[in-house]
């Protein structure tokens, strides 16, 4: 057979700033460039562009584009703030409807992949797969309704029951289910009834050729006044799942150490709340910086002495923070405020590349940050181990795992 045609359904894609959008963009680019696949994406319009620009393009119901050899069917939907349930629901449903129409165009797909942005988009992917008689894959970046149920702003049991029913249907219908780690695999098998023979674990990644250990004193740290500070950094989305209020409370506990600076880089629905919390507490050791362009990521990561990875209690196995892999690639130690039974904890313990703290416990998080602040030898050991671990999660290796799976499914389709 020739090169397989793979179709992805996911709202976030280039030039979206979200981690999932950037990961999907890198995956599609690798499948086209390194493996010769034909790749199409049914995407939405960006809510937040990675370049910080405002999206002013004409928005038809479905617009046809190409980016680095990837075909994009840009499906129109609302772009309200994700901070409210109504706004988020409107974004979900409007994109789902236009994406379902876009999916009617694919009659020759070999593999159709449904993702989880929004959590109902897998249904549109399933319909497209059945119409094209293609193999259907569900790729879980987040598992619903558990993620929504544990975030107090989005507790709606009627909606959550519908999401649970939808996900069980998608899992039963899928030829393969992709989980981001062993804990997520267990959640899908034992919690959702997935056939263990159909579940494949493929990790997220960082590109170790783009993000690598570098000197702390660089143009970014000098420009931001961070070169002579002990920088404790959170980089990426400031969303509902991380419990970042705990990080601000940690900043209050280390404020007497004048050279420690807590730095948030990125954006998200929780950023205004965190900024307000910092102002109300009168903290001078916390800074907020915007998303950095991809070409500046390596220097922004190198500016950190220590990173923080956090996840609210109860979300282990339902979300895997993708920022971990970039931290590993940068060769920096981190404190992971996560539950013990999760992918981040497993990687931390297996590779000895960070410290673990109790989730949503600012005192324990502060203790672990200070342990690294006071012990440069420990920091260096964890940093070296982090970079070694990153090579296992390098982008070409993980993209190759996706290609092998898609090729296997495409060949099986051609034989039927």
Predicted feature locations:
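N-terminal subdomain of nucleotide-sugar transferases
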Residues: 1-65
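Carbohydrate-associated surface elements
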Residues: 45, 183, 205
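Membrane-proximal helix-turn-helix segments that form the acceptor-binding/catalytic region
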Residues: 123, 127-131, 157-179
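Conserved donor-binding/catalytic core segment of Leloir-type glycosyltransferases
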Residues: 225-242, 248-251, 263
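Acidic anion/phosphate-binding donor-loop and adjacent secondary structure
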Residues: 189-190, 197-200, 206-222, 243
